[in-house]
Amino acid sequence: MLASNLNDGASILHERMEQVKEEYSDAEWKNDVVGTDEDIEPINDFEIEEGTDLYLVEVPVKEPWKVFAYISFGDWNECPKAEEHMAIAKYWYEKHGACAAYISNDVVEYYLPSSVMGDTMPIAEEHLGYSADILQGNNLASLSSQLKKSTIWYFWWD
């Protein structure tokens, strides 16, 4: 898996986003998915439930995206395959400095050295492509705004 082609993280996200978008009419997409900013709280701490057993693992990699080659994660329901996680993680690391820092049975959380600035709607759309489950109860406008204030990116899959 370490020899996988990792130059396609952006295309994987784009393709997954288009698949999500196909599930909605234009009106549903605009009103329900994009929506309006509801000013949700930033995420600057890991979302770990109290009482959860944690294991600190030192993974022998120089590039942080390669952690997915050692910790097999994904390939169920809508969760990307481990190779796709690795390509996406490389893309986000190179573009935003994001590193996968917490992986559980159904959650991946990325740490960023600082929140992202500028137009964050394209990043929110990438997040939706990565994990369509993240919008439950929210919308892209709110997620886009949240990204400007957050140093943790939270993703989960059913």
Predicted features by range, described:
Residues 60-78:
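Short glycine-/aliphatic-rich beta-strand segments at the starts of folded cytosolic domains
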Residues 79-94:
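Short amphipathic alpha-helix segments
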Residues 6, 10-13, 78-82, 120:
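Intrinsic-disorder-associated interaction segments
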Residues 99-104:
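Short beta-strand
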Residues 56-58, 92, 127, 155:
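Generic structural hydrophobic/aromatic packing signal, biased to beta-strands
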Residues 1-66:
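Extended, low-hydrophobicity segments enriched in charged/polar residues
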Residues 94-97, 133:
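Structural alpha-beta junctions
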Residues 106-158:
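Alpha-helical oligomerization segments
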